[in-house]
Amino acid sequence: LKLPNFTKNTVATRATEQQINKLCVLCYDADDKYLGMSTISRDSIKDKGGDTYEVRVKVVPRTATLHLVTNTNVTLDEARDYDSGKNNLYNATREGNLNLDAPICWGSVKVDDLLSPSTKVWLFRQFAKASVTKDDDKVKNFEITGFKLFNTAKRGTIATTKLYTNVSLPSSVDYTNENDYSMGEHPFYETPAGKAYMIIKAKYNNGPETYYKVAFQTKNSDGTFTPMALLRNHHYQVKVTAVNHAGYSSEKEAKDNLPENGLSVEVVDDNPRIVNMIACKDYELGVC
């Protein structure tokens, strides 16, 4: 028997959430064929502070690329295609409740790049998240009691080849609505353009709770509007900046109609900044 040697190198990993409980390291050769994987436990992951972690990994000989996946187990069938033996990780999916505190993240790196001690591997959450606040200086007569996301994808892929450009959808996907209105950060699987929308539940002028529909569209340079894809690893921070009357009287009415006239919001994405989204049935909803 020949027991192959292992090459040791240090990988500094960075995530945008709070904790890495375990790390799965997958090895692929120059032709993207699967070579093997190992799992690193929490005890072997060194927290360097500032959302930076350091681990030592054993790299199988002939490895050209490492894929790193946090906080979930990866099966052999997810790691490699049965017939070709090549990387199948881009087809691996997860569904169900999302964990903001210990998120499933993915990243990849060329082994040659690890020869530099300064190399960092960036890990990306497989989901997006949204939150809602109001501008207290501009909005005095509006109490937000919660919000819900509608028609977001029910599942998502672990890895992606479209990180900065578009969503990576599973081969088949259903869409779902959140069950309850609440505040805080709501995680959701990345969703293609033209699908998802938000309903904010709030009290206007100390009146009863009413419902405001907010869609997601991007304003183009020519003034037209295009539905906006909601991408993984983005935080869509919605801030209400103006309200001039109550919303729809029921959730169903809000769902069945265009965004209600009179609610203006600013949306700040934790990657690029997008502003001046106006929820209004008299105009196209957009961001600019």
Q: Where on the chain are the PLM-derived regions?
A:
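Tryptophan-paired
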Residues: T10-R80, K129-R232, A242, A246, ...
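Catalytic micro-motifs at enzyme active sites that drive phosphoryl/nucleotidyl and oxygen chemistry
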Residues: V55-R56, S116-K120
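Intrinsically disordered, low-complexity segments enriched in small/polar residues
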Residues: T226-Y236, K255-L258
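Broad, structure-driven detector of short, well-ordered beta-strand segments within folded domains
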Residues: V238-V240
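Interdomain boundary/hinge segments at the C-termini of tandem beta-sandwich modules
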Residues: W122-R125
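Conserved aromatic anchor
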Residues: L1-N5
